[in-house]
């Protein structure tokens, strides 16, 4: 016993005392830099993603020691900051190094349309320009498919890009976003802007009149689900207590660029629609979630909202713009809510739905940006103005984002129910020279692929013919394919996108997309395994990403099987 005590005492004497706390310690230099950067701010947990943006905007990257300092200042666990920062593709976390310089990132769009126009070769060529200040990386769809291929240099876009144009942009250090001419607040008000919103606010136009107009017009959500707008507004308005409007501007579906087009030309038509929605449900605030790939749009919105506050059209901080950070999954409404709250964009299990328990645990009206864009016109001009624009028995119109092998791509406002052949011939001036129509994506990456022989299907939400074909309209992102395009490569491009953008929360999507891509990269496809994977993902995934990810695969197996060799 004495021997045991003696050994214990000896071991205790040998143990060195710790003179510093455990864990990563904040250094005064970095604490001072972060403190000065955020001087005067009242810190809120839900603004964490914006704090990370501010740090990266200032220093070019997210230094890990700055994150330690941020953790200390806002009293948030470092692990929580790291899990958020590492979730989003646009945040670049680095170890501190004396020879490390802030990086200007050159992102080459690798979406389907850009790939059709040579993005893969362009990416490899641009890699030659890399140095300690320039980093060249691939990036998902940037919402500029009508001017493919696209390259983002810093925050400045080079459209119809080639090596020389990108090199010139880098050499001239032209990294800031270009701001186009657009209808500003003064010009918008001269044309009756905000008069409808004021009439609703003051009771001159009743809520019943607003609801009747929306219902009679047949306006449906333009983000992809096609849920009746009036019904959604009514559901949220019936809840008591605090309520919010959350606008989904995370236009990440490959092939989609309509929202960007509207905001870069007529932002107040959307803002008035959002204001009307807030009056209708009696919202506390309006949160506008905008994808980080749209720096021009973000600047326009911030500038114009400041003007609205100055003219007392809205109270200060009534409209709040939140930047995303490169996560496609945040286009799903509950994932968007999580991101607005400063967390990882993981879709929530439902029920409850966000209409009941949404932003900050309150009833929340979520609308796509374009949906709100048309609200003022429908109320001002009457529901028939919108409803009668449809065709083939459908109401209203769609803003089709058309890209690919057509002569004149772009946003085409065309009747709901129009066919792809009409859209190509009457709105896009036909196929591009030297190209024969082969197939098309009616609704972006997740909407499936149809052959040119099925060119008479009405394009609208709830189109029976479209659903029977295994496809849907989604965000109305139409990509036109020709005889120059290999359908196996097309489907693989789309599945790689879903593999990259899976949030990883559920196994069917996380593992399913990875396994599907591997099987599709084989020379010969294992048809049975691919079908089994597709079925499991569709039935067991938490959200629409995993459920619809294999739609391109299913379409190729069904309509372009002659281009595939099987085991």
Language model: regions and residue ranges:
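Gly-rich Lys/Arg/Thr-decorated short loops/hinges at beta-loop-alpha junctions or inter-strand turns
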Residues: 188-195, 247-259, 354-359, 401-406
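Short strand-turn-strand beta-turns centered on an Asx-Gly dipeptide
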Residues: 153-155, 403-409, 442-443
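Histidine-anchored nucleotide/phosphate-binding helix
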Residues: 88, 266-280
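N-terminal glycine-rich phosphate/pyrophosphate-binding loops that anchor nucleotide-derived ligands
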Residues: 209-243
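Short amphipathic, charge-patterned alpha-helical segments
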Residues: 273-275, 416-432
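Short loop-to-beta-strand transition segments
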Residues: 232, 429-444
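Ferredoxin-type iron-sulfur electron-transfer modules in oxidoreductases and energy-metabolism complexes
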Residues: 15-106, 110-142, 146-176, 195-216, ...
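Hydrophobic alpha-helical positions that pack around
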Residues: 298-416, 428-430
């Amino acid at each position: 016993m004495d021997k045991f005590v003696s050994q214990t005492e000896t071991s205790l004497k040998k143990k060195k005392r710790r003179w510093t706390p455990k864990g990563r310690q904040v250094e005064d230099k970095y604490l001072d830099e972060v403190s000065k950067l955020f001087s005067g701010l009242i810190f809120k947990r839900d603004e964490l993603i914006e704090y990370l943006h501010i740090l990266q905007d200032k220093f070019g990257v997210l230094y890990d020691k700055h994150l330690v300092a941020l953790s200390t200042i806002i009293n948030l666990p470092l692990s929580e900051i790291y899990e958020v920062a590492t979730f989003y593709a646009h945040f670049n976390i680095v170890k501190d190094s004396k020879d490390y310089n802030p990086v200007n990132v050159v992102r080459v769009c690798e979406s389907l349309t850009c790939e059709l126009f040579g993005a893969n070769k362009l990416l490899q060529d641009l890699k030659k320009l890399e140095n300690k200040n320039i980093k060249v990386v691939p990036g998902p769809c940037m919402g500029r498919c009508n001017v493919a291929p696209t390259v983002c240099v810093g925050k400045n876009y080079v459209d119809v890009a080639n090596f020389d144009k990108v090199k010139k942009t880098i050499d001239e250090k032209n990294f800031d976003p270009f701001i186009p001419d657009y209808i500003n607040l003064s010009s918008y008000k001269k044309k009756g802007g905000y008069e409808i919103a004021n009439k609703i606010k003051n009771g001159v136009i009743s809520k019943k009149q607003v609801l009747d107009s929306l219902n009679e017009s047949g306006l449906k959500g333009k983000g992809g689900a096609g849920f009746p707008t009036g019904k959604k507004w009514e559901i949220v308005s019936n809840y008591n207590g605090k309520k919010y409007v959350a606008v989904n501007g995370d236009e990440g579906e490959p092939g989609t660029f309509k929202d960007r087009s509207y905001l870069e030309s007529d932002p107040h038509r959307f803002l008035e629609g959002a204001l009307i929605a807030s009056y209708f449900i009696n919202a506390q605030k309006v949160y506008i979630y905008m994808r980080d790939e749209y720096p021009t749009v973000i600047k326009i919105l911030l500038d114009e909202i400041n003007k609205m506050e100055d003219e007392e059209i809205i109270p200060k901080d009534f409209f709040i713009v939140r930047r995303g950070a490169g996560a496609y999954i945040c286009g799903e409404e509950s994932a968007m809510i999580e991101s607005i709250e400063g967390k990882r964009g993981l879709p929530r299990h439902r029920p409850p739905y966000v209409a009941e328990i949404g932003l900050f645990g309150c009833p929340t009206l979520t609308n796509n940006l374009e949906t709100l864009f048309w609200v003022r016109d429908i109320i001002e001009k009457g529901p028939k103005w919108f409803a009668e624009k449809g065709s083939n028995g459908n109401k209203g119109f769609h803003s089709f984002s058309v890209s690919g092998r057509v002569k004149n791509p772009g946003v085409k406002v065309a009747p709901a129910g129009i066919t792809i052949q009409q859209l190509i011939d009457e709105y896009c001036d036909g196929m591009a020279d030297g190209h024969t129509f082969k197939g098309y994506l009616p609704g972006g990456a997740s909407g499936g692929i149809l052959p040119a022989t099925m060119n008479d299907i009405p394009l609208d939400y709830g189109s029976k013919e479209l659903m029977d074909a295994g496809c849907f309209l989604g965000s109305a992102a139409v990509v036109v394919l020709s005889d120059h395009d290999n359908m196996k490569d097309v489907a693989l491009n789309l599945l790689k996108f879903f593999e990259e953008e899976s949030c990883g929360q559920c196994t069917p999507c996380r593992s399913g997309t990875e396994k599907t891509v591997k099987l599709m990269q084989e020379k010969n496809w294992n048809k049975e395994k691919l079908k089994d994977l597709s079925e499991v993902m569709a039935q067991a995934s938490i959200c629409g990403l995993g459920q619809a990810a294999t739609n391109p695969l299913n379409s190729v197996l069904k309509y372009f099987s002659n281009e595939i060799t099987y085991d």
